[in-house]
Swiss-Prot record:
PANTHER family the UniProt entry points to: MUR LIGASE FAMILY MEMBER, UDP-N-ACETYLMURAMOYL-L-ALANYL-D-GLUTAMATE--2,6-DIAMINOPIMELATE LIGASE MURE HOMOLOG, CHLOROPLASTIC
Organism: Latilactobacillus sakei subsp. sakei (strain 23K)
Uppermost EC category: ligase
Gene this chain is encoded by: murE
NCBIfam families hit by this protein: murE, PRK00139.2-4
Pathway this chain belongs to: Cell wall biogenesis; peptidoglycan biosynthesis
Keyword Nucleus on entry: no
Alphabetical GO biological process terms: cell division; cell wall organization; peptidoglycan biosynthetic process; regulation of cell shape
UniProt modified residues of type N6-carboxylysine: 230
Protein name, per record: UDP-N-acetylmuramyl-tripeptide synthetase
SUPFAM superfamilies with a match to the protein in the record: MurD-like peptide ligases, catalytic domain, MurD-like peptide ligases, peptide-binding domain, MurE/MurF N-terminal domain
UniProt similarity note: Belongs to the MurCDEF family. MurE subfamily.
Keywords: ATP-binding, Cell cycle, Cell division, Cell shape, Cell wall biogenesis/degradation, Cytoplasm, Ligase, Nucleotide-binding, Peptidoglycan synthesis
Amino acid sequence: MALTLDACTLILKEHHLLKSVALNGDSNLNMTGIAYDSRKVTADTLFFCKGNFRPVFLTNAKEAGAVTYVAEQPIVEGNGMNALIVTNVQKAMAVLSAAFYDYPQDDLFIVAYTGTKGKTTASYFTQSILQDATNKKTALFSTIDRVLGPKPEDRFKSDLTTPESLDLFHDMRQAVENGMTHLVMEVSSQAYKKNRVYGLTFDVGFFLNISPDHVGPNEHPNFEDYLHCKLQLLVNSRHCVINAQTQNFGDVYAAATTTTEPENIYLFADTSYQPAQPVNIDFRFENQAMTLAESRFKVTAVSKKAIQLGVSGDYQLRLIGDFNESNATAAIIGAALGGADLIAAQQGIRRLQIPGRMETLAVEGHGQVYVDYAHNYASMKALLSFLQKEYNQPKLLVVVGSPGDKGVSRRAGFAQVLNEYADRAILTTDDPGYEDPATIAAEILAGIDQDKVDTTVEIDRATAIKQAIEESQPGDIVVLAAKGADAYQKVRGVDTPYPTDMVIAKQVAQQLS
């Protein structure tokens, strides 16, 4: 992979990003490396000065072999280097990274998901189906991990829901070189806020739902900005699939129609849903049977274009909850648009078990434990309301924490949902970052009505889990929320190893047996 200085200049001009160029040598200079982290610079590297940039980073990059830097203003430490001064370094990084890695998106059929809840689950379902349809040639970029190929060494833990653009195009190119033909990925609102997917057009873009989340000093200033960023996925997709039951449906559908013809927009909803405005629902789904281990549901194509996809039928799901049937229906539609047939869809849905999603453990002499990634008001409400209904109003004990440095609005959301459904809550640690976990817990606690919800704080997460399980009685439900299968706690910039909630729950169960 390589990129000349002339090519960089032309690309930046084409995207109206270039302010000025300062050359220090041959404009045909061939750059064989690309980086935004000075620790990853090698000889003849193109270096981006982005984010929380400090001039010493450019000094380090220059010493390591960087020959050109991209920034929004000239930097003294870059004297002696070529300088590309741009209006927006994040956008510049996206378009130059795509070119450096030779536009790998052109070699992939890309299905992308956005939504406040369900992105990860729907993405896993879609990849599972497409793995059958493509003979295991479907990559996955999710909140949990990145799957770039068929081998174990092609699987990596994710740091961000949507990677930085340079990493995104690198991983796409690696996936293509590993023989992948399809890619399923999550696209966060921050990906558009920070231009991580700038210039990308998706083959299929999904809008699952929207509710207030990710609003805070380090994320979105308000809900309107959050919604606007979410909508950009539809504006940049060739086919759009929308959950017709989403909040702000009118705004969502209008965004899709700005760049996509109606015949390439698909709507889905459960059979009981009657839209407030006259729209044609293309797919309906309906629960047929549910146990505490699985659910069976039916997907029916209603419109002519939906029938042509050929995926109407009965499905079996190893995840319970009507919200998971909705996610699975989305995946069936997305995979069908990517070439999957009914058999691949049924097999892919039936076999999948997603780590950290509705994992359950029965503890002898105590309650039933559920581990789930539900990490905001909307997903917690869906989870707790479902468990309350299925178990006929059990006592609900919830262990939960909220992350530091982001998603400040989640804290009030957790308090609200605990007030609505929980009998007992233990507030604990979940990726505190640079904040004090006790302060985060106190913010959640401030919104809880303790006359309704017996609430305590136990900062050590393992101890909190042990306490909740020990307290529980047969017939109770213990929910270990928001962390899923995450094997780390993010503390002051360091990923600190953590056994996972389920591992700790199993250890406690063994001690109690």
